[in-house]
Amino acid sequence: MDISDWRKKIDDLDRKLAALLNERASAVIEIGRLKRNTNLPIYEPDREREVISNVQQSSQGPLAERDLSQIYERIMDVMRSIQKHEIVPDPAPRSRETELDSQLED
């Protein structure tokens, strides 16, 4: 395979990763709803350690455990933010109108 073939493969893998991350986010939203209804905390460090351990144990390389840990810490940070917004909705939804839109209407 040449470099363009490898790049096509990476593009395909990136699309699959994005789909899986969105699927994970949907599951996180459902868990966030359950947490809200049962008054469970958003941040559960034991569960996050368990997730990282599971990923590291299932990995067959070439990523080092440290690298996987960093990747998953970031993923879980983003997912925690999604849960936070699910459990504690924004009290003042942002308007889609911009300052420029307001000036154009004047």
What are these regions (language model features)?
Residues 1-106:
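Domain-level signature for soluble enzymes in the chorismate/prephenate branch of the shikimate pathway
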